[in-house]
Amino acid sequence: MSKKIVIIGSGFSALSAACYLAKAGNDVTIYEKNSTIGGRARQLKKEGFVFDIGPTWYWMPDVFERFFADFDKKPSDYYELIKLSPAYQVYFGHLDFVTIADNLPEIVATFESIEKGSGKQLEQFMAEAKSNYDIAIKDLVYRPGESPLELITLETAKKVNQFFSNIKKDVRKRFKNMKLVQILEFPVLFLGAKPSDTPSFYSFMNFADFGLGTWHPKNGMYSVILAMETLAIELGVKIETNANVEKIDVTNGKATGILV
């Protein structure tokens, strides 16, 4: 049975949820308090310049591909994606930087040039990171997140020891040069946690970095927001901007309406 559904906010999660709910046959309306959509991924236009004011890294392109595929679409139907080469540079001071290539063999060579033996160590580290990535995408990322028990699968059980160690410990066991250590520890910051608090299993973020590469949508990350907006509208979602939700009416523990 079709339901009338209200979504407050218009960031990535809101637009994604709106698309899936509309596809399921629901009457969906997004209410956004700002004049433009995007949430933390909004865009700033000023004095002839355009800025992404939120995310600037496009990693894990397979996740975006899967999202659009759920609606028989492709990212390329909406925006052009460019793989950055080199991927990025990490600065440690004035004219003191390490360039990260767009492919693993070159990155391995870069590591080896900085610390003897680190190339082989990186290959081993990345093999484990890829294994973790495959498990994360298959068994974890798309779970609803309702219970810690969702983390327990046959595959994750085989990796149980990695949930009792952390990224900082694993990286520093393999690498001594602090530049290499910092390069390998920083990806988990995108998860909102420190390397010392992040289980070793989350090295899959390193595979997202070195294995899948860093990408950039032409015209900026806001292109992805516009793509999701277009898809949502195609699915019948209504989007109201300058619509601040002042109150959620609740009756018998259930939301029954909103005050805008």
Give the ranges of each region predicted by the language model.
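Helical element adjacent to the flavin cofactor pocket in flavoenzyme catalytic cores
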Residues: 204-255
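Generic recognition of stable, solvent-exposed alpha-helical segments in well-folded globular domains
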Residues: 10, 16, 63, 106, ...
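N-terminal glycine-rich phosphate/pyrophosphate-binding loop and immediately adjacent elements
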Residues: 3-131
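A broad, structural surface signal
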Residues: 19-23, 33, 109, 127-134, ...
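Active-site-adjacent bridging/hinge elements
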Residues: 31-34, 199-203
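Rossmann-like flavin
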Residues: 93-199
